[in-house]
Amino acid sequence: MKKLSMREMLQAGVHFGHQTRYWNPKMKPFIFGIRNKIHIINLDKTIVMFSNALVELKKIALAKGKILFVGTKRATRESIKSTALICGQFFVNYRWLGGMLTNWKTVRQSIKRLKDLENQSQDGTFDKLTKKEVLILNRELISLENSLGGIKNMGGLPDALFTAGAEQEHIAIKEANSLGIPVFSIVDTNSDPDGIDFIIPGNDDAIRAINLYLNIVSNVICSDELNKETH
C-alpha cells in the first residue's frame, strides 16, 4: 500500500479546519493549533488514522464486502459517484433518505419501482402513453435515480459506510451505528466524532482535499494488486 504523503495533504489543504468559534471540543485531540482564527488539524494524526482506516477498508474489499460511499454536498457529488463506480461499489450522492439503511425493506420496494420504470422506458411501454403520462413517469424515474441509483444493485445492507463528511452525513452514520455497520469518515473540526469507528481528521469542504481522500481510498480498494489477490 502506497505511503501517505504529508506534502500532498498540505497541498490539498487537508490541515485547514473551520473557524475556531465553530469547533467541536471533541475534536481537540486532533487539532495542532490555531492560525488566523482557524483550527489547524494535526496531519501526523491524520496519516496514522487514515492508514489504519485504509487497512480495514482493504480487508473488507478483499472479502468482497460492499462499501457504501456517502457524500451529499454539492461539491462532493461527482467525486463520490465516480469513486464508487470505478471500484464497483455503491453510493448516495444527492439526499440521504431517512431509513435508507434501517428501513431497507421499504427502500427495496422503491428500488424495484425504479427498475420497473427503467425497463418500461426502454421496452416501448412509454411509447403507448400520453405525453403527460410520460412526463410524470420520467419525473418519478429521475427522482428515484437521483436518490437510489447508486444503491439499486447493492442487493442488501453494506458491509461498511464511508462518508466524505461527518456533520453533513450524521443521519447515515446514526443508521449505520444502529445496525452495527462500521463507519469510516472524514471528520472536520466542527464535527462530532462520536459513532465513527474509523476517524480521519481532515478538511471536509475543500474539493482538492475530498478528491485526495477518495483517490487514496480507490487506489487501495480497487487497485490491480488487490484484484490479483482476489483471483
UniProtKB/Swiss-Prot annotation:
Ranges in a coiled coil = none
Q: NCBIfam families, alphabetically?
A: rpsB_bact (TIGR01011)
The entry sums up its family as follows: Belongs to the universal ribosomal protein uS2 family.
Q: Which InterPro entries match?
A: Ribosomal_uS2, Ribosomal_uS2_bac/mit/plastid, Ribosomal_uS2_CS, Ribosomal_uS2_flav_dom_sf
GO terms (molecular function) for this protein are:
structural constituent of ribosome
What Gene3D superfamilies is this protein classified in? Glucose-6-phosphate isomerase like protein, domain 1 (3.40.50.10490), Helix hairpin bin (1.10.287.610)
The record ties this protein, via PANTHER family, to: 30S RIBOSOMAL PROTEIN S2 PROKARYOTIC AND ORGANELLAR, SMALL RIBOSOMAL SUBUNIT PROTEIN US2M
Keywords on this record? Ribonucleoprotein, Ribosomal protein
Q: What is this protein called?
A: Small ribosomal subunit protein uS2
Q: Listed GO cellular component terms?
A: cytosolic small ribosomal subunit
One of the Pfam families matching this protein, by short name:
Ribosomal_S2
Superkingdom, natural source? Bacteria
User: Which terms does the UniProt entry file under GO BP?
Assistant: translation
